[in-house]
Amino acid sequence: MSEQFRALIFILAMMLPMLAMARAILGDRVIPMVDLDRRLKAWVGILLSAFLARNFWLYIIISGALMAWVMSKDKNPMAVFLSLFFVVPPTTTFIPGFGPISYIIEINHLRLASLVILGWAYLKMRREKSVEPFGAYMLDWLALAYLALQVILFLRSDPTVTTILRTSVELFIDGFLPYFVASRAARNIPALRDMLASFLFAILMLAPITIFEFGKNWLLYTSINEALGLGWDVMPYIMRNGNVRPYATAGNSLILGFILAVGVGLYPAVRSMMTVRNWYLSYALLIGGLCASLARGAYVGATVAILVAAGTGRGAGTRLSKLSLGAAFVVVVISLSPFADQVASYLPFIGNVDTDNVTYRTRLFDVSMQVIAMNPLFGSSNFMLDPLMEQMRQGQGIIDIVNSYLGIALGTGYVGLGIYVSIYLVAMAKTWMGIRRSAVVSPELEGIGRALLGTNVGIMIIIATASCFLSMPFIIWIMMGLSLRYSQLTTNLGAARVGQGAPTRQPEPQRRRTPGAA
C-alpha cells in the first residue's frame, strides 16, 4: 500500500470520531445541524479529493465545487470558510498565463476558499443595506493603508502592470477579503457563536494529527504533493532533539504552533457553548497538540494570551488564582515525573535544545537594524540582496526572516511597521471597550471579548518569532475583523438595552447537565 493511502487511512481514523464529536457537541446547540452536516460532508469530500484526485486541477475543481455548494445553502459564509480552512495543506502552484504573462497568481487551498467563499460573500454583502460600507471604521482605513502601501512600494522593484495587478489581487484575496467578511458577517450573537465554534473546532482537529506526527515521527500530509503531481518545497522532516517537528495541514511547524496557540488563546470564548466536561477534555487535547508542535514562540504567545484573558474583566483575581494553582500543580507533577529533564529542554528561555536558533535570531535583529537604517521610512524592496544580509544565509541557501516585525520594517520601513502595529492597537482598543460595555449586559460576550483580547496580544508576541506566510496572514486579518465585529455587536446590544430601558442581560445558551460526547 502506498504511503498516501496509509496516511489517508490514519487521518480518517482520527478525524471521523472528531467529526462525530462536532455533531454531538455543536449540532443544533451552536450550529444548525443541517448546516453542520453540510460543512462536514464538504470537509470529507475536500480531503478525499486531495488524496485521490491524482491531479491538482481536478482537486481544485472538486474542492471549489464543494465550497460553492455549501456556500449557496449556508447563511454564515465566514463560518463555512473557517470550517474548511485547515482541511488540507496549502499546496501551491501557479495558474498558467498566456502570451507574455508567465502566470496569473499562485493558487492553493487557502486562496481557493477565500475566492469561492469570501469572494461570494463580499459581492453579496455589498448589495445589502444593513452591512456597513467599507470605510465606516478607522480600522478599515488602516487596513487599506497598509495593503495599498505594499502595492505602491512594490513599484520600486517591478513597475510592470502585470506584476502590480497580480500583487493587488493576491493582497485582496489574502488580506482584504478575510478582514472585510470577518468584520461584517456576524449580524447577531448566534452568528458570532457559529463563527467562533467553527474556527476553534477546525483548529482542534489539528491537535490529534500533531500529537500523532510527533509520537510516530511521520508527517501524514507530505504525500499529498506527490499524489497531486507537485513538488512543493515544504522542507519535510525537520528534527528537534530527535523528534520530528509536526506540520499537520499547516505546511510549516512554526505556522502550526501559531495556529494551535491562537486556538488555545481563543478557546475560553466557547466555554458557555458546551458542557464543563467536554470543554475541559477538548481544551486539554488542544493544549496537548500545542505542546507537541515544538514551537517555543507559540508556547510563550499562548501563555500570555491565557494570562491576559484571565486577568481582564470582572473576577480577574479569582481566575488568576485558580490559574496559578493549576499551573503549580502541573509543574509539580512534571518535576516528579521521569520526563522532567526532557520537558525542560524544550521550554523557551531555559531549554537547551537548538540554542543556535537563539543566536541566529539575535544576529538577524542586529543585521536587520543596520539595513533598515539605510532606508528607514519606506524600507527597500531588494533588502535581501544587501551585502549585509548575506551573512545571514543559512545552510539551506536561504535567509530566513524569522521575525515578522523585522520583515515588515525591511520591506516597508517604519511607516509600514507603524501602520501595521496601529491595526493591532486599534483592534485591541475596540475589544477592550467592548469588554467594558458587555460586563453589564452579557457575561458570555465579556468572556468572548477577553479571549479575543488575549489572543491578539499573544499573536503580537508570536509573530516576533516567525515569518508571516502561508495561513498566518489570513488568520491575523480574520482576528482583526472579528475584534471589530465584536465591538460593534456590544455597541448594538448596549444601545438596544438602553433603548428598552430594561436591566436584563443577553440570554446565554443553556448548559447541558447530561454528559455529552467528548
Question: Whereabouts are the PLM-identified features?
Answer:
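A membrane-periplasm/extracellular boundary helix in multi-pass inner-membrane enzymes
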Residues: 5, 208, 213-220, 237, ...
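Long extracytoplasmic/lumenal interhelical loops at the membrane interface
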Residues: 340-412, 431-440
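N-terminal hydrophobic segments of proteins, predominantly signal-anchor/transmembrane helices
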Residues: 70-176
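Transmembrane alpha-helices of multi-pass inner-membrane enzymes
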Residues: 16-19, 67, 452-512, 516-518
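Hydrophobic alpha-helical segments of polytopic membrane proteins
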Residues: 15-16, 20, 29, 34-44, ...
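Alpha-helical transmembrane segments of multi-pass inner-membrane proteins
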Residues: 144-155, 196-312, 433
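Hydrophobic transmembrane alpha-helices and their immediate junctions
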Residues: 271, 278, 303, 307, ...
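A conserved mid-to-late transmembrane alpha helix and its immediate loop/hinge
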Residues: 248, 252-254, 287-291, 295, ...
